[in-house]
From Swiss-Prot:
Residues bound to S-adenosyl-L-methionine: 73, 104, 123-128
Disulfide topology: none
Quaternary structure and interacting proteins, as annotated: Homodimer.
Catalyzed reaction equations: pseudouridine(1915) in 23S rRNA + S-adenosyl-L-methionine = N(3)-methylpseudouridine(1915) in 23S rRNA + S-adenosyl-L-homocysteine + H(+)
Gene source species: Pectobacterium carotovorum subsp. carotovorum (strain PC1)
Gene: rlmH
Family: Belongs to the RNA methyltransferase RlmH family.
Pfam families in UniProt: SPOUT_MTase
Any one GO CC term of the record: cytoplasm
UniProt-recorded name of the protein: Ribosomal RNA large subunit methyltransferase H
Single annotated GO MF: rRNA (pseudouridine-N3-)-methyltransferase activity
EC number: 2.1.1.177
Length: 156
């Protein structure tokens, strides 16, 4: 199974790149994790936000591999505690399909992305900066993997 993070935004601060890459390199070869960045639509005073969101959504869905399970990152999604996420990761592995996790831009996810999703995951009831979400998702999935393989990274 391959994990794919599809995120709006291409110009991340160095700390995001450093943090995300640190977890990315830890994933085992049998569970590769990749990042696909979608350029954010140009926002300005007179921008058509609805159209920008629609375009970003189209690009996100086009980046998702055929047959992939789509999981959106969204506040109203399901909140998993770490052991529950580990169980979810095991179910995804048993399913045999690759998993695409979608992170929207400043206005969130396009309705088309939400409609295409099989699951929605909420990291927190707080609104989090999208760059930070990349690092949190990578760390959370790595921690979940460590639980499923009895790796010493996670401690109770």
């Amino acid at each position: 199974m391959k994990l794919q993070l599809v995120a709006v935004g291409t110009k991340m601060p160095d700390w995001v790149q450093t943090g995300f890459t640190d977890y990315l390199r830890r994933f085992p070869k049998d569970m590769p994790f990749e990042l696909l960045e979608i350029p954010a639509g140009k926002r300005g005073k007179n921008a058509d936000i609805k159209r920008i969101l629609e375009r970003e959504g189209e690009q996100m869905l086009a980046a998702v591999g055929k047959g992939n399970r789509i999981v959106t990152l969204d506040i109203p999604g399901t909140r998993w505690e770490t052991p529950q996420l580990a169980q979810q990761l095991e179910r995804w592995k048993q399913d045999g399909r690759d998993v695409s996790l979608l992170i929207g831009g400043p206005e969130g996810l396009a309705p088309e992305c939400k409609a295409a999703a099989e699951q929605s995951w909420s990291l927190s009831p707080l609104t989090l900066p999208h760059p930070l979400v990349r690092v949190l998702v990578a760390e959370s999935l790595y921690r979940a993997w460590s639980i499923t393989t009895n790796h010493p990274y996670h401690r109770e």
